[in-house]
């Protein structure tokens, strides 16, 4: 196996040597690929020049690696048969699992991470590395050299997994190795290691804190470009709570206990991790990692509390400000609204909380209903599930949104764009300018999401309104049909009643009741109300369609995307300059892009809020129409009940009339029904008794007529009996009905006699 810079391809059975993965002070790491199974492993071998002590510690490292089993520590593998024979020395090879994602340094060096990783990526990294360090410390192992180069990435089923490599057992820190080490790597070493003092597990706390700070901000916390000797003498002057020692563009060294901006953390995480970093970056090892709540070495438990936070992110659409709230599993939505009122001044009853799809939060569910697992997305999106806050007391939304404050160095070049800066200063400040333009674009996108959430909510309300409109129109048609039928029926009844009054039954009370029914149904129908509401809803529908057709109502890219891409390209070209061309330069071009981005942001925000105001007006109209439609539907329901009740009453009256009519035909009846009146019906036997007195004096034809009359008399008697039986049965079935509103039978007889 050759360790020269240009590797010659070697094979060992089915295994084929691939590229070099890394080169360290003690040897190289090479990727090997099994051509039959597709398996890949990383083989590490140390150089021959190791001292006897380091050779012994190297063998010890291999033994320890083989017994470690943890998802965040690179696992040892068996060295393929025959591969040890390819080694140029007698030191054993170390076979490890191969992680395809490369190391963390490569990840941090990506352009988009120049101002720190995304929030989701930071949280997963902190979780993984803390878990690995805990495991190592529980096994009485101190890493001592934790840095981005010693953390590799492996893509898991749901997210990236971070694994610690190079446990550092073969490293001997003497004065010579410190002087020849790369400047940057020494800053991850705890001060007591640099001072060659006794150390404990707290050396890993310092390294972890430095690593975490760099992942959050994009740069190391303490004078990253200084030489070791000057660095040590200056940084040791910091207070116990200082987590940043930086040099501004004027060369002034500043100490700070605050997490610097820009970074991609929300306000709650930034505050909590700032306090946690103060524990991890204490200069004195005995105090380092001591948490006020959990005591010595309590930093891991304190970090657990941070990682387990459940956060709700509320974007106040009135001000454009994001408010983040830690919530418990059982915290109610009402409790969250009370906290929102304290921060925003918007009363609870006026707060409307919408998710991105336009769905309102459900009052009976806990506040955690809008939280998803943000750790799974690795920060590739905006990293948070936003809930959009609207003030229902507002009819229109004014543009009150301003760009976020710029970092100090960016503000400096905005004032002096022609000022020449050193290359390392340009690299940092240009990265911050690009990040500022990215932030403007993301803030604009969030506001656009809020406007679209309001639009989606409007469409949901409009859909509900449309369904109610269709139901109202259908009910109106059905009611109209019933009313028309009833009016026609009552009109026919009145006409027929009028026709028979001369020879039939009359009742002023019945006539009055029918007239009152006719007047009562004239008040039913609600046709005018329905017509007016339909017209208003159609006008609203037109406004909503216009909103949807408007270019402002659709998600769009535009100038901010173009400016962000131009800034990225400028930054990329700066970083990729050859070392001999990394000279001083000004920032005029970057400043021009930033100023254009700010102008574009302000213009887009005005457009978004114009659209939002129109959306709110339409929603207000929809909300005003909903109860009116419900009221008309309710009134039509009552009208329908009224029509049914009147129809039932009318039917009962008709049956009562039939009863009265039947009671008048109990005696024999002669002649046609059309020729009978009440007085004649009252003397059914009178006609039949008259012909018998002169029957003997009649001629033969007259006798036959008399026989026919007698026969008719008998038939009338039979009919009278049948009618009486029928009336008796009807009397029994009608006894349960309330007939108090009609006249009694005696009153009816009296009226009939008077009429005759």
Curated annotation (Swiss-Prot):
Region described as NEMO-binding: 737-742
Region (Disordered): 667-706
Function, in words: Serine kinase that plays an essential role in the NF-kappa-B signaling pathway which is activated by multiple stimuli such as inflammatory cytokines, bacterial or viral products, DNA damages or other cellular stresses. Acts as a part of the canonical IKK complex in the conventional pathway of NF-kappa-B activation. Phosphorylates inhibitors of NF-kappa-B on 2 critical serine residues. These modifications allow polyubiquitination of the inhibitors and subsequent degradation by the proteasome.
Name of encoding gene: IKBKB
Written domain comment of the UniProt record: The kinase domain is located in the N-terminal region. The leucine zipper is important to allow homo- and hetero-dimerization. At the C-terminal region is located the region responsible for the interaction with NEMO/IKBKG.
Native organism: Homo sapiens (Human)
Name of protein: Inhibitor of nuclear factor kappa-B kinase subunit beta
Record field: transmembrane: none
UniProt-reported outcome of changing residue 181 to E: Full activation. Interaction with TRIM21 is enhanced. Monoubiquitinated. Strongly promoted NF-kappa-B gene expression
